[in-house]
From Swiss-Prot:
The gene is Marcks. Residues 238-255 have a biased composition (Basic and acidic residues). Belongs to the MARCKS family. The modification Phosphoserine is found at residues 26-27, 29, 46, 63, 74, 113, 122, 128, 138, 140-141, 152, 156, 160, 163, 218, 246, 291. This is Myristoylated alanine-rich C-kinase substrate.
Length: 309
């Protein structure tokens, strides 16, 4: 830039004129809201502000530095005033950029423009998937109903399974109760078997006692028979002899029947009572023996008694 300052005086005059123009251009820009290089929202409506908009478009295309270089070549040597002008022109560019963006956004909003139609088509395309999505939820809304039904079915199945578990528990309790009853029945059967076994030895002992008593009676009868053929004159000698066999028979009856109970005791005492009865019979037979003719005994086995002297 220093080489450009050293050009001809004509160019210097032109540069001198440009600072005045820059001052004139800067004053309305400041009046429109540009202060210290900051642009307000409203931007510049002056023709000087429109030029920076064109420069911004060139910068947007990537040719803004070339335009800056062409201006010093065509306008001659650039002075510090021209540099200030360039800075002032570059400052309102952001405001113009925002205005252009707003205009570009506002243009598609027009209904007759093709861009609006394309946007409408895109909107319809986007809305159609939304509508399809809206239509899709209807099956999805149906499927939740099915799911709800399935869920209720699962609930019923779970409830049925729960009742089945209850039946299993009841069956288990019933099996335990049956096992307990079976055990009780086994215990009762074992107790009954033990009672039968205990009763069987008792019965056997009772039977042995009864047999012993019967044997004792038969032996007493046999002992009474030899007493009868004795002579009737010796009843006193016969009495102690009869008592002795009766005692021996009683002892023998007690020996074969050790398991006899107290009920068998009268049977043991019976022979003792029968023995005196047997002694009374020979005494009665002794009375008729005093007659001259002897009388034979009632028993056929007994031999005839000798004649008394």
């Amino acid at each position: 830039m220093g080489a450009q300052f050293s050009k001809t005086a004509a160019k210097g005059e032109a540069a001198a004129e440009r600072p005045g123009e820059a001052a004139v251009a800067s004053s309305p820009s400041k009046a429109n809201g540009q202060e210290n290089g900051h642009v307000k929202v409203n931007g510049d409506a002056s023709p000087a502000a429109a030029e920076p908009g064109a420069k911004e478009e060139l910068q947007a295309n990537g040719s803004a530095p070339a335009a800056d270089k062409e201006e010093p070549a065509s306008g001659g040597a650039a002075t510090p005033a021209a540099a200030d002008k360039d800075e002032a022109a570059a400052a309102p560019e952001p405001g113009a950029a925002t205005a252009d963006k707003e205009a570009a956004e506002a243009e598609p909003a027009e209904p007759g423009s093709p861009s609006a139609e394309t946007e409408g088509a895109s909107a319809s395309s986007t809305s159609s998937p939304k509508a399809e999505d809206g239509a899709a939820p209807s099956p999805s809304s149906e499927t939740p109903k099915k799911k709800k039904k399935r869920f209720s079915f699962k609930k019923s199945f779970k409830l049925s399974g729960f009742s089945f578990k209850k039946s299993k528990k009841e069956a288990g309790e019933g099996a335990e109760a049956e096992g307990a009853t079976a055990d009780g029945a086994k215990d009762e059967a074992a107790a009954a078997a033990g009672g039968d076994a205990a009763a069987a030895p008792g019965e056997q002992a009772g039977g042995a006692g009864a047999e012993g008593a019967e044997g004792g009676e038969s032996r007493e009868a046999e002992a009474a028979e030899p007493e009868q053929p004795e002579q009737p004159e010796q009843p006193a000698a016969e009495e102690p002899r009869a008592e002795e066999p009766s005692e021996a028979v009683g002892e023998k009856a007690e020996e074969p029947a050790p398991g006899a109970t107290a009920d068998d005791a009268p049977s043991a005492a019976g022979p003792e009572q029968e023995a005196p009865a047997a002694t009374d019979e020979p005494a009665a037979s002794a009375a008729p023996s005093a007659s001259p003719e002897p009388q034979p005994e009632c028993s056929p086995e007994a031999p005839p008694a000798p004649v008394a002297e």
